[in-house]
């Protein structure tokens, strides 16, 4: 497992990569998700942006390089938040990291949506990615730093 001593445990990210009617899933090896096929993701490292974190997590966990397209979901809890992105495959062959997962594959979307070992959250986020709508990064200099995400009219007109 990764050493998360330099990790902000309150902020995490995930991404949904869909290519040729298939979604990239990894079979988790520990915790409550052990044996479940999930979308890649993890915690932000200190000073890391959410978009950089999701790119890093995909590369570490699956060997796949992705570009971030838009935000498709936000889960806010009492002590944490979780951003879900739609991501686009750029390069790389899917492979297990041999640590956090023991298998990685491009799974047919219909198969994934019907499997009991694919959690509801993963299915919900795959459906969000398929809907074709999401929040985009909006070029805007924020007073306190960070990134503004919103619906860009030019994309959705």
Q: Where do the model's predicted regions map?
A:
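Unchanged
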Residues: 44-68, 77-128, 151-157
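Short connector loops/turns at beta-strand edges and beta->alpha or beta->beta junctions
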Residues: 22, 29-32
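A short gly/proline-enriched turn/hairpin at secondary-structure junctions
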Residues: 38-39
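A short linear hydrophobic-aromatic micro-motif
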Residues: 25, 67-72
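Short, solvent-exposed loop/turn elements at beta->coil junctions and helix N-caps
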Residues: 3, 71-75
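Charged phosphate-binding loop/patch that engages nucleotide di/tri-phosphates or the phosphate backbone
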Residues: 128-157
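A conserved beta-turn-beta hairpin within the catalytic core of GNAT-like acetyltransferases
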Residues: 31-35, 81
